[in-house]
């Protein structure tokens, strides 16, 4: 079932997808490995990260992805450029 994305949230969701993709790559993870660590499907990760796409997803999924990336969910939401302390902070 596809969810309609509020126009006001579209840019935020796109930016969130970019942040997830950027940090995933920085961590050296494939979409498949991130999906496995987060307990979600690879196709969901792919749709969240898809350039120019605004994929709506649950807060539970956001928390699972942020845990898998060893970062606070708030840092993903607020990210446009990650400070060095976030990139280097691995559990």
Name what the model sees in each region.
Residues 21, 32, 63:
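Residues within the helices of the helix-turn-helix
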Residues 25, 36, 67:
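Alpha-helical residues within the helix-turn-helix
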Residues 30, 41-44, 58, 72:
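Short coil turns linking two alpha-helices in DNA-binding domains
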Residues 39-55:
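Recognition helix of helix-turn-helix/homeodomain-like DNA-binding domains
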């Amino acid at each position: 079932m596809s969810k309609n994305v509020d126009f006001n949230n579209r840019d935020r969701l796109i930016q969130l997808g970019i942040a997830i993709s950027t940090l995933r790559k920085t961590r050296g993870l494939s979409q498949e490995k991130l999906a496995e660590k987060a307990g979600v499907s690879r196709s969901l990760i792919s749709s969240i990260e898809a350039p120019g796409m605004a994929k709506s997803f649950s807060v539970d999924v956001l928390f699972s992805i942020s845990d898998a990336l060893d970062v606070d969910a708030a840092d993903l939401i607020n990210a446009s450029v990650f400070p060095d302390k976030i990139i280097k902070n691995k559990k």
